[in-house]
Regions:
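Substrate-binding pocket helix/loop in short-chain dehydrogenase/reductase
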Residues: 103-105, 109-117, 143, 211, ...
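Alpha-helical segment proximal to the catalytic Tyr-Lys
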Residues: 133, 179-183, 243
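The beta1-alpha1 cofactor-binding region of Rossmann-like NAD(H)/NADP(H)-dependent oxidoreductases
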Residues: 45-46, 66-78, 110, 228-229
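Conserved glycine-rich cofactor-binding loop
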Residues: 13, 20-21
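Short C-terminal tail/terminal secondary-structure segment
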Residues: 2-6, 99-102, 235, 246-259
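Residue(s) in the substrate-gating loop at a strand-loop-helix junction
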Residues: 148
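Active-site helix of classical SDR
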Residues: 128, 166, 174
């Protein structure tokens, strides 16, 4: 097998949470360009339909599941619908998540804390359970968890540490699952993005413009990442190009964590 052939995903199916827009949409496109069929999970039917219409042009099968993964029940339902398609899912990209609120930790309600943990952490666990069992039965699969550089560090100027805490836990879950499933054919790795030009981040910067410059000043490359710059990394981790790699995290942050 040639080096380039190791990156090919032809005939495999990838389940991408939050796959209809933002970083998830960009990663889904890269997986499709490498030959993977897609099952996109998202909350909004219109956004899913638009993504499906565009991605099928790449010559792959694209199915969509409208679901809200902010509850464990929603994640179970999404996985069940995907499995009911009768297509073996060999790649799971746990991308869905978000900060959503900017509240000081001392004022954070436990109800909201739990809800955001469900979104950023529990959804990944549930999807790994529901889709990981068939992978283990087949002895083959790759799971890619999207963590964040906010896992090992506290982002300056942002209040409320639910996101940092959940993403740190997702990194720990990545390593734990990797150790548990390594000799059963299922690899589990993570990507930790830095600050990227996405719609949610644009909203944050519009509401709090001082943060934009604060973050930019902390990036040695002097720019934010573009969503398509995550694509090659997810293809690498999903493919046989990383066949001897599990429990690892790729940090893609323009050097943010160098300082």
């Amino acid at each position: 097998m040639s080096v380039l052939d190791r990156f090919r995903l032809t005939g495999r199916t990838a389940f991408v949470t939050g796959g209809s827009r933002g970083l998830g949409r960009a990663m889904a496109q890269s997986l499709a360009e490498a030959g993977a069929n897609l099952i996109l999970i998202g909350r909004e039917a219109e956004t899913l339909q638009h993504a499906q219409t565009e991605l099928v042009k790449l010559g792959v099968r694209v199915d969509t599941v409208q679901a809200d993964l902010s509850t464990p029940e929603g994640a179970v339902t999404a996985c069940g619908r995907a499995l009911s398609l009768g297509i073996p899912v060999e790649i799971l990209v746990n991308n869905v998540g978000g900060r959503r609120v900017n509240v000081p930790t001392e004022d954070f309600s436990i109800t909201e804390w739990n809800a955001l943990f469900n979104l950023n952490l529990t959804s990944a666990l549930v999807c790994a359970q529901e889709l990981g069992k068939p992978m283990l039965a087949r002895g083959r699969g790759s799971i890619v968890n999207i963590t964040s550089i906010a896992g090992p560090i506290a982002m300056k100027g942002i209040r409320g540490r639910h996101y940092e805490t959940a993403k740190a836990a997702l990194g720990a879950l990545t390593r734990s699952l990797a150790a548990d499933w390594a000799n059963r054919g299922v690899r589990v790795n993570a990507i930790a993005p830095g600050v990227f030009e996405t719609a949610p981040n644009s909203k944050w910067f519009a509401a709090m413009p001082e943060f934009r410059q604060t973050f930019l000043d902390h990036i040695p490359m002097d720019r934010f990442g573009q969503p398509e710059e995550l694509g090659p990394a997810v293809v690498f981790l999903a493919s046989d190009a990383s066949s001897y790699m599990t429990g690892a995290t790729l940090t893609i942050d323009g050097g943010f964590t160098c300082w």
